[in-house]
């Protein structure tokens, strides 16, 4: 302990120089049973007033403080020495053990953050410590007395306020300050209990200086994490209680303002910022507001979650990031990831439809018609699609690796017209947020396609249905709290599209400007997470409609190499998403300790404008078999996706 006291003494001047926080929320007791909340910068305006329930009839609350090890739980002591744990939002009090002391008044009540014990001092010079988990008396310490060498050595202390510095969980150093009212006969005195060489457990007081304010025994006193010291003093004549800032170096008190009404106030606790106020976005604030609604006194995983957020206070942005992890933001990319199979289908089907429009050279060197090329055709391709969606606002970075196989069968019933069917399977591994384990999507899909042309003009069209089977995993880790919720859900995608353009041939060189449109209707079913402890969510159904235009051109060249025809094609285009509204995800915590009221999360959409580029290599001989290899990329600042495919087609 001596090293801790030396550290505390050396840092005193620094702590005392910190100005009061103008937006700090503070709480005090009036009428003995009502918890009043005000803003430290405007103490005359009551933010909330809550009746404390659950305390024994005829008793009153005299001292309050937040426990550093569980900083959202307000602890209190009554005039008969009973310790209570209170939910400050609801006012519901839970008795902790049995009374630790007989009748007491003029109470100083504060937590020692280094040992997680409650210090209680009184105007009758009592000085004792209480175990917060049981309410039991830990030990009676020495009678409060000024040090023999102190300027006030002969004074009889009337201590009615106590506060420790550095009130954070796991603190390794702290200093105990007390306020001596001097029986309201002179301005109150600020003192330390103990110093660098004397333990506070001896009850020895050392004068810091006069507050300059005379007060009766209704005193409140607390020190914030950043060293701001606040006190409530009550004028002996007017009985008006006012809020003051206190200089821990000189003892001088500076008036901030009168507390509301003409009632007496007793006790003071500086509350932490609300979780909602920690959010940097509306979605984070919504998550925080739900956590602010926690019920009862947090215990177990609920306490670990809440304490984990609070422990991040010293790192800018860390609390907002924790709220993001607790949101359904990791699931906001599910509709886009669910379109993997559709993207693969569209790319391959439209490419094959183009091949159907006369890519076989006859023996005399002329281009074959559909009918010349064979009335029945089949194709089979396999490949992979991989990439990521970038992080933006409330959307975390999501990566995925997909493999697929699909094939089709078509019938050419006119020289310029063909129809066909296709189907396939897609398997996707996805990380929904950085650090999370892999989620898996299995998709079965099938559809129809067709092509028709008149002269250089053509129209290709397709439609498909995709069944979705998701095994979901996300990871949560912050401030000592961690969880890995999992879930299973399904869904489906209806999609259809068409492409039209003009195809020109210039002696082996081909140019094809085109325009395409695709509509997709995605549904990901509602689900409830498992294994998420206090952070598990119920997530509502997600629906998304997409109407996308694609405008671009293809340039190709084909040449005879030995007995084979080799075709090389390059393409580029611009995508425009016309239905880009931000979807709402309705979600709720499963943990009743956090409240299960649904709240809305507004997903951050991907940019509506992006680009694509690709290339195809095709090789065919005089027989029915042709081989193709294709690469396609979609990109902008929000996404980077590549698709690689190899396959074969057969004409009969």
Model segments located where?
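Outer membrane beta-barrel transmembrane domains
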Residues: 419, 537-652
């Amino acid at each position: 302990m001596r090293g801790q006291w030396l550290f505390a003494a050396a840092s005193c001047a620094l702590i005392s120089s910190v100005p009061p926080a103008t937006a700090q929320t503070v709480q005090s007791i009036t009428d003995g049973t009502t918890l009043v909340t005000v803003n430290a910068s405007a103490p005359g305006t009551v933010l909330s007033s809550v009746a404390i329930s659950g305390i024994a009839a005829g008793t009153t609350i005299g001292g309050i403080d937040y426990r550093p090890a569980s900083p959202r739980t307000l602890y209190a002591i009554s005039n008969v020495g009973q310790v209570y744990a209170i939910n400050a939002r609801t006012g519901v009090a839970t008795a902790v053990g049995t009374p630790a002391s007989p009748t007491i008044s003029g109470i100083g009540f504060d937590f020692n953050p280094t040992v997680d014990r409650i210090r209680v001092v009184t105007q009758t010079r009592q000085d004792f410590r209480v175990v917060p988990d049981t309410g039991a008396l830990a030990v009676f310490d020495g009678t409060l007395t000024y040090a023999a060498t102190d300027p006030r050595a002969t004074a009889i202390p009337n201590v009615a306020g106590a506060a420790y510095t550095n009130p954070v969980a796991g603190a390794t150093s702290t200093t105990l300050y007390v306020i001596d009212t001097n029986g309201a006969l002179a301005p109150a005195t600020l003192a330390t209990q103990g110093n660098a060489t004397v333990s506070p457990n001896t009850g020895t007081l050392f004068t810091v200086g006069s507050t300059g304010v005379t007060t009766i025994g209704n005193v409140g006193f607390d020190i914030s994490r950043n060293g701001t010291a606040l006190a409530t003093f009550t004028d002996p004549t007017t009985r008006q209680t006012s809020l003051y800032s206190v200089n821990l170096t000189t003892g001088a008190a500076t008036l901030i303002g009168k507390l509301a009404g003409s009632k007496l106030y007793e006790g003071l606790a500086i509350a932490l910022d609300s979780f909602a106020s920690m959010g940097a976005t509306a979605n984070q604030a919504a998550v925080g507001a739900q956590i602010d609604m926690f019920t009862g006194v947090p215990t177990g995983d609920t306490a670990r979650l809440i304490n984990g957020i609070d422990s991040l206070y010293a790192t800018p942005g860390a609390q907002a990031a924790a709220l993001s992890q607790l949101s359904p933001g990791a699931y906001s990319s599910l509709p886009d990831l669910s379109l993997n199979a559709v993207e693969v289908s569209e790319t391959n089907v439209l490419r094959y439809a183009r091949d159907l429009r006369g890519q076989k050279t006859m023996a005399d060197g002329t281009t074959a018609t559909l009918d010349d090329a064979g009335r029945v055709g089949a194709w089979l391709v396999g490949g992979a699609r991989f990439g990521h969606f970038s992080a933006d606002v409330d959307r975390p970075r999501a990566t995925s690796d997909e493999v697929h196989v699909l094939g089709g069968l078509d019938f050419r019933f006119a020289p310029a017209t063909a129809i066909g069917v296709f189907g396939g399977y897609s398997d996707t591994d996805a990380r929904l947020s950085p650090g999370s384990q892999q989620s898996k999507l299995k998709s079965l899909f099938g559809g129809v396609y067709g092509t028709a042309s008149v002269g250089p003009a053509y129209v290709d069209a397709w439609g498909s249905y995709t069944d979705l089977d998701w095994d979901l995993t996300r990871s949560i880790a912050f401030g000592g709290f961690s969880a890995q919720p999992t879930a299973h859900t399904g869904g489906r995608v209806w999609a259809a599209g068409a492409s039209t353009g003009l195809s020109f041939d210039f002696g082996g060189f081909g140019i094809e400007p085109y325009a395409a449109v695709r509509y997709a209707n995605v549904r990901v079913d509602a689900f409830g997470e498992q294994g998420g402890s206090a952070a598990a969510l119920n997530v509502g159904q997600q629906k998304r409609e997409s109407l996308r235009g694609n405008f671009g051109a293809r340039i190709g060249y084909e040449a005879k190499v030995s007995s084979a025809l080799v075709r090389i094609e390059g393409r580029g285009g611009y995508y425009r998403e016309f239905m880009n509204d931000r979807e709402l995800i309705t979600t709720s915590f499963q943990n009743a300790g956090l409240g299960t009221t649904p709240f809305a999360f507004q997903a951050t959409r991907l940019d509506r404008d992006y680009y694509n580029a690709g290339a195809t290599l095709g090789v065919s001989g005089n027989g029915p078999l042709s081989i193709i290899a294709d690469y396609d990329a979609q990109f902008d600042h929000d996404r980077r996706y590549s698709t690689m495919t190899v396959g074969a087609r057969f004409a009969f």
